[in-house]
């Protein structure tokens, strides 16, 4: 009885902090900060979390989840440097925490520091080989380096674990084939993405490029028109259609599209170049030289400017 009584007395005198648990008051502070975050009051959440984290004198009591939420708050505020500082500090105390590793890796990726991003994604996979964010993050790193086959090995693992994954990943997978001019596989996989979501213009653009590569020009132009219907404000889609029509030898249609485009963007050098190319093919030599001169003068050192300058010399 004496031993049991002493044990009970000892435990009753210990704080929850001594036992490694967050005291009740602390838990309430975290919940309050989390609620602020959920209410999109990110600055207030960051203030609360900063106080919550740094009031703990013992760094071992600084919770990984609090660091993660603080970093997320800074991300929402657009303060990515601060967010990364938070994650890196947290990893000093929680070096094997997968959400923190992934969060820091993603920010390095956004900053273009791919080597550092790869290192942290590798560490995350050591702790959790099936982590979806680490697999797709590493796939994107290899894709950005141009190692498309290597990127697909990570995507293959990801799809095996997540067969109903968001179609954006299937579209990125398709783009790796497109970049290697494997148009058949690119078309197959972008069609799968479109079956899940046909409202994304970029999916239709990938489909159009794959169809062009396969020689299915009617399909390619139809897909491009769908993309333009979804995003009529996108200049890149209009320019791609202009180029596609020109490559098909449909000079009148291409010129019509070009002139319409130039009404809103009269100094677009690529559009001016294709106006000149189409006009030249249609025998409108004078206007072709005029537009070519404009294209060359806007930015002479650019690729388009150099091409226009060279053509201008040949068309004299």
Please state what every model-predicted region is.
Residues 11-78, 85-88, 313-316:
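N-terminal leader/linker segments that initiate helical-solenoid repeat arrays
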Residues 21, 55, 59, 93, ...:
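Structural marker of alpha-solenoid helical repeat scaffolds
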Residues 38-39, 76, 110-111, 144-145, ...:
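Register position in tetratricopeptide repeats
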Residues 52, 56, 89-90, 123-124, ...:
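Canonical positions in the second alpha-helix
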Residues 62, 66, 100, 134, ...:
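TPR alpha-solenoid repeat register
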Residues 65, 69, 103, 137, ...:
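Canonical tetratricopeptide repeat
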């Amino acid at each position: 009885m004496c031993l049991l009584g002493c044990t009970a007395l000892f435990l009753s005198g210990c704080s929850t902090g001594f036992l490694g648990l967050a005291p009740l008051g602390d838990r309430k502070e975290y919940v309050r900060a989390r609620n602020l975050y959920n209410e999109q009051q990110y600055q207030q959440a960051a203030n609360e979390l900063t106080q919550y984290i740094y009031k703990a004198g013992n760094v071992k009591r600084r919770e990984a989840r609090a660091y993660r939420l603080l970093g997320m708050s800074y991300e929402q505020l657009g303060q990515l440097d601060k967010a990364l500082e938070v994650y890196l500090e947290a990893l000093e105390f929680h070096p094997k925490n997968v959400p923190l590793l992934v969060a820091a890796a993603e920010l390095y990726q956004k900053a273009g520091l791919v080597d550092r991003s790869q290192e942290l994604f590798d560490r995350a996979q050591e702790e959790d080989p099936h982590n979806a964010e680490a697999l797709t993050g590493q796939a994107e790193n290899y894709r950005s380096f141009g190692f498309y086959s290597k990127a697909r090995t990570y995507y293959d693992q990801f799809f095996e674990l997540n067969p109903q994954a968001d179609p954006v990943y299937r579209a990125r997978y398709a783009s790796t084939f497109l970049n290697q001019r494997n148009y058949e596989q690119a078309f197959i996989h972008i069609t799968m993405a479109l079956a899940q979501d046909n409202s994304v213009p970029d999916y239709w653009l990938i489909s159009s490029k794959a169809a062009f590569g396969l020689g299915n020009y009617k399909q390619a132009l139809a897909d491009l028109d769908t993309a333009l219907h979804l995003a009529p404000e996108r200049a890149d889609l209009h320019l791609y259609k202009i180029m596609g029509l020109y490559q098909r030898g449909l000079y009148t249609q291409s010129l019509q599209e070009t002139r319409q485009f130039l009404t809103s963007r009269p100094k677009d050098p690529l559009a001016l170049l294709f106006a000149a190319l189409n006009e030249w093919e249609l025998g409108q030599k004078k206007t072709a030289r005029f537009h070519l001169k404009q294209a060359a003068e806007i930015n002479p050192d650019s690729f388009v400017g150099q091409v226009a300058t060279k053509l201008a010399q040949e068309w004299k």
